[in-house]
Amino acid sequence: MAKKGLLGRKIGMTQVFADNGVAVPVTVVQAGPCVVVQKKTVEKDGYEAVQIGFGDVREKLLNKPKRGHLKNAGVRLVRVLREIKVDSMDEYKVGQELKADVFSAGEYVDVVGTSKGKGFAGGIKRHNFKRGPMKHGSKYHRRPGSAGAKGPARIFKGRKMPGRMGNERVTVQKLQVVRVDAERNLLLIKGAVPGPKRGLLLIKSSIKAK
């Protein structure tokens, strides 16, 4: 499968019916339109990639470096910039517009987003710890318990403990594109994708698809 990608926003979830009548849960994603801002080359940058931009923005909301970068490229002002790896750099030109129809129904994609923030969470919610007895004199209900032995007299790095949960980069792999609405730049992707409604997403070709 050719490597390609798009930026988009999560609209919400719904369901569609397959040809055999089975209801399929899908996430509706506004994918694009994106614009090619820059082509990274091995000679100049040490690697090959295509930089794409997404989302309209007023000029005064951009900082000077970003504003100058976009003006030098001769493209419209965009809110978000991301890089994607592609198979053939020759297929892309600076200023070219990428729409939802770069993907087709039946393809598999990886979706990258930022998960919903849950705030400060305990061990049971955050790490699926087992709780203690709720009765028979127990005072150990939802506490984390021992965090380490007496010997080292310290807590090792990586110890699972209560703390802030969510609001981190999450990738869900090998989700199937059920439908493509090229006119409205919509992708219907089977299953759930990370983040809240209106959350920014990067949709790219699945690395696990055969």
Swiss-Prot record:
Out of the domains of life, which is the source?
A: Bacteria
Q: Known Pfam families for this protein?
A: Ribosomal_L3
Locate the compositionally biased regions of type Basic residues.
132-144
Show the segment(s) annotated as Disordered: 132-152
Q: Which GO terms describe its molecular function?
A: rRNA binding; structural constituent of ribosome
List UniProt keywords, sorted A-Z.
Ribonucleoprotein, Ribosomal protein, RNA-binding, rRNA-binding
InterPro entries listed in its UniProt record: Ribosomal_uL3, Ribosomal_uL3_bac/org-type, Ribosomal_uL3_CS, Transl_B-barrel_sf
Show which residues constitute the signal peptide: none
GO biological process per UniProt: translation
GO CC annotation = cytosolic large ribosomal subunit
Q: Gene3D superfamilies, from UniProt? A: 3.30.160.810, Translation factors (2.40.30.10)
- Family stated for the protein in its record: Belongs to the universal ribosomal protein uL3 family.
Q: What PANTHER family does the entry give?
A: 50S RIBOSOMAL PROTEIN L3, LARGE RIBOSOMAL SUBUNIT PROTEIN UL3C
Q: What does this protein do?
A: One of the primary rRNA binding proteins, it binds directly near the 3'-end of the 23S rRNA, where it nucleates assembly of the 50S subunit.
- NCBIfam families for the chain: L3_bact
Quaternary structure and interacting proteins, as annotated: Part of the 50S ribosomal subunit. Forms a cluster with proteins L14 and L19.
Put simply, this protein is called Large ribosomal subunit protein uL3
What does the record give as the organism's lineage?
Bacteria, Bacillati, Bacillota, Clostridia, Eubacteriales
